[in-house]
């Protein structure tokens, strides 16, 4: 599975919302789709499935706010 599909699947699983792929520029924090607990789970899933290490202390919410931004960061860190 490629990075984009993996991220979308992780987000859908974490949020229970399969419609994430319909709006890849939706701000996941402003809409309440992701909270701090889900963010930690997201980072753990990215680490486990894509071998990407993002220390929580270095996490900048603005850089990870939308599905498209998450995909871009994941590709950058691979």
From Swiss-Prot:
GO cellular component: cytoplasm
Key word Cell wall biogenesis/degradation present: yes
Keywords: Cell wall biogenesis/degradation, Cytoplasm, Phosphopantetheine, Phosphoprotein
Modified residues (O-(pantetheine 4'-phosphoryl)serine): 36
Subcellular location per the Swiss-Prot or TrEMBL entry: Cytoplasm
Function of the protein: Carrier protein involved in the D-alanylation of lipoteichoic acid (LTA). The loading of thioester-linked D-alanine onto DltC is catalyzed by D-alanine--D-alanyl carrier protein ligase DltA. The DltC-carried D-alanyl group is further transferred to cell membrane phosphatidylglycerol (PG) by forming an ester bond, probably catalyzed by DltD. D-alanylation of LTA plays an important role in modulating the properties of the cell wall in Gram-positive bacteria, influencing the net charge of the cell wall.
Record-linked InterPro entries: ACP-like_sf, DltC, PP-bd_ACP
GO molecular function ontology, one term from the record: D-alanyl carrier activity
Protein name: D-alanyl carrier protein
Family membership: Belongs to the DltC family.
Pfam families: PP-binding (PF00550)
Coiled coil start-end: none
GO BP: any one term: cell wall organization
Keyword DNA-binding attributed: no
Domain Carrier intervals: 1-78
Superkingdom as given in the UniProt entry: Bacteria
Pathway: Cell wall biogenesis; lipoteichoic acid biosynthesis
PTMs per UniProt: 4'-phosphopantetheine is transferred from CoA to a specific serine of apo-DCP.
Main location: cytoplasm
């Amino acid at each position: 599975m490629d990075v984009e599909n993996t991220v979308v699947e992780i987000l859908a699983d974490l949020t229970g919302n399969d419609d994430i792929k319909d709006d890849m520029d939706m701000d996941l924090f402003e809409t309440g789709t992701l909270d701090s607990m889900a963010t930690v789970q997201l980072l753990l899933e990215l680490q486990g499935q894509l071998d990407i290490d993002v220390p929580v202390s270095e996490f900048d919410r603005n850089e990870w706010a939308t599905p498209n931004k998450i995909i871009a960061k994941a590709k950058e860190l691979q």
